[in-house]
Amino acid sequence: MADISLLYPKRKEVSAMTLTDESINDLSVDYIVESLTKDIYEKNSIKKILTNLTCDIDVINYRADVFEDILNFPELRDGLVELLKKLEDLRELEKFNKDGDASSLWQLINRLREIDGYVLCITMLKNILNTIPIKSQGLLDLKQTIEDIYNNGGFDILKKDIDETMAKAQNLKSVTIGVNLDSVLKPKNAGVISLNSFEITNSGILKNFMGFTGSKEELNSDEKVLSSHKLHPANPSLNRTKFGSIQQGANTNVHIDTSGSATGDDPLSQSLKKVVTDILKRMVKSIKATLQKYVNISGYSLVGLMPEIIFYIRFAELVDKMKEKKLPVCKPLAVHDDRVAYGEDIYNIKLAIKRTNGEEFDIIGNDITFDNEQRIYVMTGPNRGGKTTFTQAVGHCFLL
């Protein structure tokens, strides 16, 4: 997946030039980006693409063709929007895995989630691209890559393995914990009573409690537990205190038992964490064996498509709004002829954005030609006569 891009043709080495801060300001790039999305990640992705320009004719036409497909097929766009949600999950998972403090246990479980997300995204892309008559080389190349992966003899086995392993991992819904108390009814240690395939509800807890309070046999004598862990004192101080002393807390007085060394952690939470971790360690042995077969698969390779998909979709949404306002739009054609540019009825996209936001005013289009006969224009006219607006519109034609 690393060599697939919706911005650049395969095996195409292209140099790009980055707009200066002055040019970004003159072209109101931030205004345009802000109108497309409020999501910070999306804004940064779109701005990065907009401000890194290429003059390569093949790349420009390649992008125009991809955008045409995404614009012309709303069902393609809808499918890609759903795909973005799954890719966002993978992106968040990737950020978590870069956390050096994450335990090996959770890294293993997240590796399972990563491959599961990979399988899901490949399947979604296949279903999306196979049902739409796309024409652009970029999307056709992506379709072929997905087909090659999906039809590979190992993909069905991968999908089956991951589905079965995820089912095992997701089957554990709750753990019933028993907490031992000392002579003054303070938590002493905790043990696992049962592993459950159902979630415990508040109503169930209340029902059991009411049953206990109304029962003739008030205490259960069954001693069987699966495992137990010692509890450390709650809210310990750095100094050792005598049994029965009172520590002044931020909001209330807390009774401290200092029979063990201070840890600074909530005792019950820490004990439960250890119990659950021990259970999961046993459960993930089969997961680890499954994942070792797929060490070369990276679900994060698909995340690289996110900024490109976002870029096309958000501009397609803007063009749809412009069409609703009867504003003219067209597909540009980049030609190999030396230093020529022709624009007919061009207008400033900032005005179009204001129209789509509900402002009512007339937009006047203008023609522009750059060739050997007309290379330099001198703009004259009164203040607020449209000189800056028109000059910016010319810049937008090249930017977009």
Spell out what each predicted region is:
Residues 1-192:
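Conserved amphipathic alpha-helical "coupling/scaffold" segments
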Residues 2-9, 18, 308-385, 400:
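Conserved NTPase motor "head" modules and their coupling/switch loops across ABC/AAA+ ATPases, GTPases
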Residues 99-130, 137, 141-149, 153-350:
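Conserved P-loop NTPase architecture
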Residues 194-200, 360-363, 398:
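Short, low-complexity, polar/charged sequence segments that are solvent-exposed and flexible
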Residues 385-387, 391:
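Conserved glycine(s) of the Walker
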Residues 391-400:
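GG-anchored amphipathic helix commonly corresponding to the ABC/SMC/Rad50 NBD signature/C-loop
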